[in-house]
């Protein structure tokens, strides 16, 4: 059973939002306070978002569908790949190609082409053609691989999409909403939470925060067949929480 504590969220810097001037007004309901012109997110609502997302993910996996992990920003790319592979889920961590969801059949043809090129390399076909042709095919394979490797085994549309930084991944959101695919996403203070089915208020820039959220989703997938949920440990009262925020805020300013 995954155990999430308020302290672990604080240590990952989950509570730090953006500068006050960058606030999306629709995020006001997730704001706890303001410190040194930085918004502090309400971790109680973060915990609720984690719980809701955990339950949705497990429901999707039990239905036989997959969760597509998406995070193309520098801080998220490697983490998205690692956690998606750990839970044997599809992922996109380089660039979202328009139509990956809304034009899935066309994308599948590109995936089939990539698989064919990989097979040609393995079965000795490359050894039977000219170096010039091999060079051209390798360039084509590299180009396809860069954007499609993570979804090579995604035979059908996912049951849900998990996103890091919805502001950056707006095309993904538009496609998922059009198809009625549930969206789980970490929402920072500059994001619009209203287009997300399961918003998780949190820092989507700090690597430790991104890693924590992505691991939680991966854990939910891996534990879906064990009939276990998530344990939330709220081990800080409001006074302790404010004290921790002050300390963390001072460290951030240094």
From Swiss-Prot:
MF (Gene Ontology): structural constituent of ribosome
Superkingdom, natural source: Bacteria
CDD domains (UniProt xref): RPS2
Record flagged with keyword Ribonucleoprotein: yes
Xref: InterPro entries: Ribosomal_uS2 (IPR001865), Ribosomal_uS2_bac/mit/plastid (IPR005706), Ribosomal_uS2_CS (IPR018130), Ribosomal_uS2_flav_dom_sf (IPR023591)
GO cellular component, as recorded: cytosolic small ribosomal subunit
GO biological process, one term: translation
Alphabetical keyword list: Ribonucleoprotein, Ribosomal protein
Disulphide-bridged cysteine pairs: none
Entry annotated with the keyword Ligase: no
SUPFAM superfamilies xrefs: Ribosomal protein S2
Pfam families given in the database record: Ribosomal_S2
Family as reported in the entry's similarity comment: Belongs to the universal ribosomal protein uS2 family.
Protein name: Small ribosomal subunit protein uS2
Organism this protein belongs to: Borrelia hermsii (strain HS1 / DAH)
Higher taxonomy: Bacteria, Pseudomonadati, Spirochaetota, Spirochaetia, Spirochaetales
Gene responsible for this protein: rpsB
């Amino acid at each position: 059973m995954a155990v999430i504590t308020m302290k672990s969220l604080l240590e990952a810097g989950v509570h730090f939002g953006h500068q006050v001037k960058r606030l999306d007004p629709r995020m006001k309901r997730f704001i706890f306070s303001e410190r040194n012109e930085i918004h502090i997110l309400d971790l109680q609502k973060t915990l609720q978002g984690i719980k809701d997302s955990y339950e949705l993910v497990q429901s999707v996996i039990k239905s036989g569908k997959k969760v597509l992990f998406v995070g193309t920003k520098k801080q998220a790319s490697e983490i998205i790949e690692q956690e998606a592979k750990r839970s044997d889920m599809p992922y996109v961590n380089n660039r979202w190609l328009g139509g990956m969801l809304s034009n899935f059949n066309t994308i599948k043809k590109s995936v089939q082409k990539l698989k064919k090129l990989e097979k040609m390399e393995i079965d000795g076909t490359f050894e039977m053609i000219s170096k010039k042709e091999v060079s051209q095919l390798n360039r084509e394979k590299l180009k396809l691989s860069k954007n499609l490797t993570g979804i090579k085994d995604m035979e059908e549309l996912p049951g849900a999409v998990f996103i890091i930084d919805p502001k950056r991944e707006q095309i993904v959101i538009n496609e998922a909403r059009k198809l009625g695919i549930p969206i789980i996403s970490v929402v920072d203070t500059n994001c619009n939470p209203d287009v997300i089915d399961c918003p998780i208020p949190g820092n989507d820039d700090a690597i430790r925060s991104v890693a924590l959220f992505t691991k939680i989703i991966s854990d939910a997938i891996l534990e879906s067949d064990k009939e276990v949920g998530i344990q939330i440990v709220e081990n800080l009262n409001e006074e302790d929480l404010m004290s921790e925020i002050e300390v963390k805020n001072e460290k951030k300013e240094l």
